[in-house]
Amino acid sequence: TVTISGGTITEASGGYMAAGIGSGYQGLGTVTIEGDAVIKNAQGGEAGAGIGSGTYGDSNILIRGNAVIENAESSANGAGIGSGQGDLYLDGDGMVIDPTVGNVTIEGNAKIENAKSGYGGSGIGGGAIGIGNVIIRGNAQIGNATGGEEGAGIGGGALGTRDVTIE
């Protein structure tokens, strides 16, 4: 579990399959960014989220208060903000889908600018083969959420499903 309640973090980078801020490979937990926290340039490694989970990791992300996030990015298959990449493989009986699971809630006066992913991931939501929900409410502001090829700006990544609610 990671909680950031204030201050400024710049240049947080995850290695291969890890998030820039959050969990590593197969990590579980919650990432909360709140208060007057400012995050600039959170970069996930390939298949990891910029902010959220690494590959095969499940996490919930809560961004609230007056938090500001600028430039959260996954190089490929993870979300800019959300889950990393899940798995798809052959078993003796057929295809097995093992998704990452994560929910993203953005609320209060939180502001996000430039959340993006490379191939397969979403800007905000799921990585490739990821499931969960995105909830945006209150006075939250989002500018420039960009998914990679086969990924949504806000929603699911490739082969993933997401419910998006704006309240």
Language-model regions, residue ranges each:
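Surface-exposed loop/turn motifs in large extracellular/passenger domains
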Residues: T1-G14, I21-Q43, I51-E73, I81-K116, ...
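Beta-rich catalytic cores
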Residues: M17, A47, N77, G120, ...
